[in-house]
Amino acid sequence: MGSRASNSPSFSSKAETLLPSEYKKNAVKKETIRNGKKRKLPDTESSDPEFASRRLIANETGTDAVSNGNKNDSNANNNNNNNNKKSSEVMHQACDACRKKKWKCSKTVPTCTNCLKYNLDCVYSPQVVRTPLTRAHLTEMENRVAELEQFLKELFPVWDIDRLLQQKDTYRIRELLTMGSTNTVPGLASNNIDSSLEQPVAFGTAQPAQSLSTDPAVQSQAYPMQPVPMTELQSITNLRHTPSLLDEQQMNTISTATLRNMYSSGNNNNNLGNISGLSPVTEAFFRWQEGETSIDNSYFGKGSILFWLNQLLSSEKIAGVTSKVGNDINTNNNNINHQKLPLILNNNITHNVSDITTTSTSSNKRAMSPLSANDSVYLAKRETISAYIDAYFKHYHALYPLVSKEMFFAQYNDQIKPENVEIWHILLNAVLALGSWCSNSCSSHHTLYYQNALSYLSTAVLETGSTDLTIALILLTHYVQKMHKPNTAWSLIGLCSHMATSLGLHRDLPNSTIHDQQLRRVLWWTIYCTGCDLSLETGRPSLLPNLQAIDIPLPASSATIKEPSIYSSIIQESQWSQILQQKLSNNSYQQSAGECLSWFDSVQAFLDHWPTPSTEAELKALNETQLDWLPLVKFRPYWMFHCSLISLFSVFFEEDAPTDNNVIRCKELCLQLSSRNIFSVATFVRSYAFNSLSCWYATHYLVRSALVPLHFASRISPQHALWETVKAQLLSAHEAMGILSQESSLAAKFDGILTKNYSEILQREGINKSQLMPPPTPLLQSTSFSDLLSLWSANAEDAPRVSNSQMPQSITITDSLLQSSTTQMRPPTTSGWPDTNNFLNPSTQQLFNTTTMDDVYNYIFDNDE
């Protein structure tokens, strides 16, 4: 035994490899550290196999049985109890420093030997517990998930768990679970949940917070349950099945009182929305994002045009509409530039442009490629910027004369130093964005100027109030509205209107100059008109002050002079916006059909006061003025008036089969308004050349007007009295959209919808006519007229013989016949008798539906009986 111990390799030699038989012997020579001192084992321990065996047992049991190896067993047991405290101080793994350096760690606490020697921070990381990759563990997890799903179904029997899991917002899920679990505790059955739901929680009543876990650590992290009104609990319908979609088992678990509380308004505390006449909200929460990643879940009022647009285009009754067409029409993000491009503008200021998302209604024939470095250099050139500024004042300034041309060019040419350089660059980039878009340039250029304008909106700028900043904000609002971003436009118009009222733009300042008065009037009424238009389009409460708090007059115009004025458009729009704002403030969406008709009669005189050019002389006179902006100025107010009325009356389209005569009159009135608008837009696009601005307005109002005949076409039959009117409107809208689609991708998309619906109308009309045709006359058992023709014809041997069994029984009018047939009824001859030569020609078989001798007799002798 001693020879084997002496021949064993040394413990300090790390390069040598220990054999398995020698490992146990050398294990007794391990150096142990106690209180920072090394203790060397006696030689007897290394040579005596009894001590070696005791050391192995100590390593396995965690006791130090070798320290008193020469004593008896009773003394050894006592020492083991005393040394348990020392062994507990040894960590389960090496410290972080030893693991990083690949050192052998003593695993002592608080500091190991190596860290103490080299003066290092000794830190022991928690041991990582890895999931076992076994079938048993996977089965256990599957069973646990199934139990959790069943537990959630018992807690929330009317919720769709799959849709709940799709929610990515963890905080929002906690809120929904908190609202849904009010007055519930784990383990309750479905009937107990029903009883708790039957007792609605009054708003402001304190409720105890319930936790889904008994662990105090988990309870401390849980969100407390806040008192929630029952209306908010009822509004979480996107995570629930509707009652019609619930299966029989779930319907049995829900009591009748629960459904009555969830889908009715029986409690006064929870009926605030119904008291004010508002429609119930059908979403659990709203969220929108109109940047690179589009999220369209914003709130639109039930009577708004955007709500109706989404509902109608997502309906299965409209042909050619996919599930995402409504979103594509409202938001069209096609081009993304992921490069950060510098843009050098006036005053030698370089600004970095953030990532750009291009949204445009530019031509679908033009390629929309991302911006390159050459494009950024081109857009920063003095010539390019000057061209876009000229385009702005040529096209957009005629509609909204907001910018003082003299002051703007004085600052642009460095003749006047701007008061705030950042605000000046916001205004300059806003002008460039609209000018670039109006000039039919590459669709991705204007987005660079827009993003550059936003980059200057710093905290210092938002803490400043000035007229120039207000002008820049309203121009940015118009820009994002043209890019089909209604939510961003709504946010900007709110900021703009609040800044305008803080500057007192809604009040008249008699001591100011005429130029300043005109500028303040135009700016305020532009903000007012834009806010009213967005409020009507989205169905949201207006942010504008009451008319009683506004005393600033309308802009002055040369109305007595026959020359056109750039203030005509804003004056007409302001007058109409005042009428609409007064209507919206009276909760117009909840007025009856009779009240709406009475209100329409009161504004009929105003609509007649601003007619649109319709005669050929008036249309020609607009072209002779050689003012590109004048046709749009003349037509756009007319379109706006009618689309506003359509939006107000669209709330009555929810009833498919109304019984109230006033509701029927309101729907027919919408059809008349849409007819005027559609034919007016069609006249405009056929008579005048248009740019991006006029194309956008024509498409914008044509889409909203064409929704009315689309609604009627999906709900009436060809025998209806309005069928021909609907058909004519769809055809005219289709022709106008075809012209606009050359410059607008949005028009091209909607034109596809109109084309498919018009084809479906022709198909329905053809099928209906074939069904209404009288049954064919029974064939007689005599010789048919076709047989006689074969005998009378000079080419009798070449003419085919048609038997009675081969004769068609009826004629079906198909779409191809309706679209391509140009054959008219043959007028009678001068003598009153039919042409004999044509009569004897075999080709005249097509004149008869049947070939009986009665028809031949009636045809020859002109007998109508």
From Swiss-Prot:
Localization in the cell = Nucleus
Compositional bias segments (type: Basic and acidic residues): 22-34
List, in alphabetical order, the Gene Ontology terms for molecular function in this entry.
DNA-binding transcription factor activity, RNA polymerase II-specific; RNA polymerase II cis-regulatory region sequence-specific DNA binding; zinc ion binding
Q: Which SMART domains match?
A: Fungal_trans, GAL4
Annotated positions binding Zn(2+) 1: C95, C98, C105, C112
Q: Where is this region: Disordered?
A: 1-87, 818-840
PROSITE patterns documented for this protein: ZN2_CY6_FUNGAL_1, ZN2_CY6_FUNGAL_2
Q: Where does this protein bind DNA? A: 95-122
Please provide the record's keywords in A-Z order.
Activator, Carbohydrate metabolism, DNA-binding, Galactose metabolism, Metal-binding, Nucleus, Transcription, Transcription regulation, Zinc
Q: Name one Pfam family in it.
A: Zn_clus
Compositional bias segments (type: Polar residues): 1-15
Output the Gene Ontology cellular-component terms. Answer: nucleus
Annotated binding of Zn(2+) 2, by residue? C95, C112, C115, C122
- GO terms under biological process: DNA-templated transcription; galactose metabolic process; positive regulation of transcription from RNA polymerase II promoter by galactose
Amino acid composition bias (Low complexity), ranges on this chain: 67-85
Origin superkingdom: Eukaryota
Q: What does this protein do?
A: Positive regulatory protein, that controls induction of the lactose-galactose regulation of Kluyveromyces lactis.
- Protein's recorded name: Lactose regulatory protein LAC9
